[in-house]
């Protein structure tokens, strides 16, 4: 028989903001909160007014000109040292440059991309 756990909220027993999960097949543990994606978006940068096609924890999107976009994060990050991952389709390679601040990130492409995808990992405020 398969076990099933149904809950609406998880909270650490000894530390409310920390839950350890045993990795698959071993006794190694990882922190659940650290492993979650904190923000992600998908948008079409070639649209005259780019908008999210889908997103999580992202409020608005600003087009600052050819190949330069700013994603605003709904629930701010704890600092500006979070990790970002950006990629795109079409023929516009993504720059490795991203300007991160607590509540948003500016991303750069070689040109206006077709679809652009962006993810954030790190600590929320």
Q: What is the role of each PLM region?
A:
Residues 3-4, 11-77, 104-125:
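Extracellular receptor-binding modules and their adjoining Ser/Thr/Gly/Asp/Asn-rich linkers
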Residues 78-98:
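Terminal beta-strand-rich extracellular "head" domains
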